[in-house]
């Protein structure tokens, strides 16, 4: 389709599949990641239409530095960077550590989207879209991670109102359990996995391609009247009305 697309956290999992989908559609894609080797390897594997940039989307200085590498116009921004940072930290032993663990999760999952969107905003082309990856945890609860993803949904509602007059849309996709990602950092037990699948209506885990397909739809002309929404993609594990 010859669009220009940015996908944060594009070196693996959902972000990689999203970038692959846009590349297959004929779009130019810039993927970002915190570490040079994996993001550059991902771009090389995805093909010549995909470029890589090293950036921690939660770090204002790194996002500021990234702006020099951004294309002049952007049609699609996918805020995918994030994840439950509690898996990377020991349990808090006091209030200082508790505050730090919450701030890290909020930075990774909410502030990263806010910063990237602010950086890209002047480049967003009319008819474009901002799509952020939320989580079922925003509704079912998961401590700091769930709170951060709930905040993402609330922020998106205001963002949609701001961008609407410029013919831009903004939506959140809230995945449930998605296999073939590193979300659980190897800590997912067989019993927990079975319970997550049993909770679905269709009896299967989600895949990165399920989320990528939803992203591509929201970025398509068919979705131009969808904005300010949270789209649940969880196999019926959590239903909305």
Predicted regions and their residues:
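Conserved glycine-rich cofactor-binding loop
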Residues: 11-13
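The beta1-alpha1 cofactor-binding region of Rossmann-like NAD(H)/NADP(H)-dependent oxidoreductases
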Residues: 54-65, 210
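Conserved mid-core segment of classical short-chain dehydrogenase/reductases
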Residues: 83-103, 144, 184-188
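A glycine/serine/threonine-rich, flexible loop-to-helix segment
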Residues: 91, 165, 178-200, 240-241
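Catalytic loop of short-chain dehydrogenase/reductase
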Residues: 95-101, 129-165, 177-178
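Short, small/polar-rich loop/turn modules that mediate ligand/substrate recognition or access, typified
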Residues: 164, 169, 226-228
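Short C-terminal tail/terminal secondary-structure segment
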Residues: 216, 227-241
């Amino acid at each position: 389709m010859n669009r220009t697309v940015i996908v944060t956290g594009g070196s693996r999992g959902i972000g990689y599949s999203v970038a692959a989908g846009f590349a297959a559609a004929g779009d130019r894609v810039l993927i970002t990641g915190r570490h040079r080797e994996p993001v550059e390897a991902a771009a090389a594997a995805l093909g010549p239409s995909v470029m890589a940039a090293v950036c921690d989307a939660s770090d204002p200085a790194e996002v500021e530095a990234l702006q020099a590498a951004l294309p002049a116009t952007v049609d699609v921004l996918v805020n995918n960077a994030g994840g439950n940072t509690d898996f990377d930290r020991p349990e808090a032993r006091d209030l200082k550590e508790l505050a730090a663990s919450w701030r890290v999760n909020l930075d990774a999952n909410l502030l990263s989207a806010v910063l990237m969107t602010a950086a890209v905003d002047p480049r967003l082309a009319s008819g474009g879209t901002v799509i952020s990856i939320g989580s079922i945890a925003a509704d079912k609860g998961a401590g700091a991670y769930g709170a951060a993803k709930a905040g993402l949904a609330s922020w998106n509602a205001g963002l949609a109102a701001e961008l609407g007059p410029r013919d831009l849309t903004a939506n959140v996709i809230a995945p449930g359990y998605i296999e073939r990602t590193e979300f659980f950092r190897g800590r997912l037990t067989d019993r927990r996995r079975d319970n997550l699948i049993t909770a679905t209506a269709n009896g299967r885990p989600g895949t990165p391609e399920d989320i990528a397909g939803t992203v591509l739809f929201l970025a398509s002309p068919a979705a131009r009247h969808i904005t300010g929404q949270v789209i649940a993609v969880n196999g019926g594990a959590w239903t909305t009305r």
